[in-house]
Amino acid sequence: MRKLLFILTMALAIGVLAPAGSVWASPGQDQLTGTGTLGQFGDPTAHVNAIQTAAGLRGGFTIAYPDGTFAVGSATCLFVSGNTAYVTSQITDSGGPRQQTNSWFAGSYIVIGVQDNGEPGTAGPDMLNFSPGFAADPGCGPNVSATPVFPITTGNYRVFGVG
């Protein structure tokens, strides 16, 4: 129960800070923001807020499952190409029944892939995927373990790229 409360508190804190993220970002800076829930694989919800600023990358992620599994971390790399973004992050906290299966341990890395298909109801749904944990930093950019191929059932992601 305390872990679930922690997850909800973290998600709320990130949600409160997300609008401030647009203050950090100015035109010409890559960013990925949003929250989405998959309607499969246990219905996880992934919140991502990563903004490349002149001072460096800011942001993080929270992934939470209804069964209490969660992972929280800080963004280490943001890669944007068109309407698709990949965020590599280092996990700072995790727990729950899927922690071992997903290899989500503090200090390990995860890659989250998102495809922004426009505002909900205007095109197909945004797409999402995330990797299992990596013991070493997998690097920056597209990762086959996180290719965004699964549609979200609720939520919205926004991808902004420099070019």
List each language-model region with its residue ranges:
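Positively charged n-region of N-terminal signal peptides that target proteins for export
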Residues: 1-4
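Bacterial N-terminal signal peptides
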Residues: 7-19
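Predominantly extracellular/secreted and cell-surface proteins with exposed
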Residues: 38-114
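Acidic, low-complexity intrinsically disordered segments
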Residues: 117-120
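C-terminal partner/receptor-binding element of secreted or periplasmic proteins
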Residues: 122-163
